[in-house]
Amino acid sequence: MNAIAFKTIGIGVTFSPNLEANINEAARFALCFGSKLVLIHVGEASEKKSKTFQKFLSPFKSKNLEYEVLFKSGNPVDVILSSTVEKKVDLLIIGALKKENFLKYYLGSIARKITRQAKCSVLLLINPSIERVPCKHIVVNGLKDPKTKETVTAAFLVGHKLGVDKVTVVEEIDQEEVSVNVDDDKSLRKSTIIKERLRLREEARVKTILSTIPANYTKDTVQLG
């Protein structure tokens, strides 16, 4: 299997409380993989913004981080997607505020639109830190899609590179497949059987993907969700 190669890593940057932490995480990731880092800011360029970005990037200049700051105005989703194509980004990092119901946040945010439409790998960063904190857990979407095998493989290769403790593959099931009106014991049993069959089907599909990944990358880290 070929080693994962992120020649260019992009990150969408906004002036949120996590800006410095997001930049630091992206810079460390770029250095780890020997990648160029592209900061994508949706908005007009200004001297103040540029100085802020340069200030946060300055600790990594001595480590020979190659980077570029890109300013573009427009719709956030359109700007980020077009910028990843223009700059030939292999991995896009998006800072996401963690909420109690992360799934609800993910499904209702622009992050979903970007992850569905992006032509590159996407990493949602929910616990950024200014100082390095070892990554312990990666969650990857295992939905049925032509790109899923590549996505899951990349997640395990990255996890191996970062030394994570656990990689969770989350399976998505269409609600229409499990839509059964439960109004008596018979319909309840039917609903339970359908859900169990779907669970077994999805687990078998994901395990088939995992069987193609080197065992030393998946050993003691796999969790299906």
Language model regions located:
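Small/aliphatic-rich secondary-structure junction motif
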Residues: 1-55, 59, 63, 136-192, ...
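Structural motif
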Residues: 49-51, 77-82
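Gly/Ser-rich helix-loop-strand patches that form or flank binding pockets
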Residues: 81-131
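A short, acidic, amphipathic alpha-helical segment used as a generic capping/interface helix at domain edges
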Residues: 205-210, 225
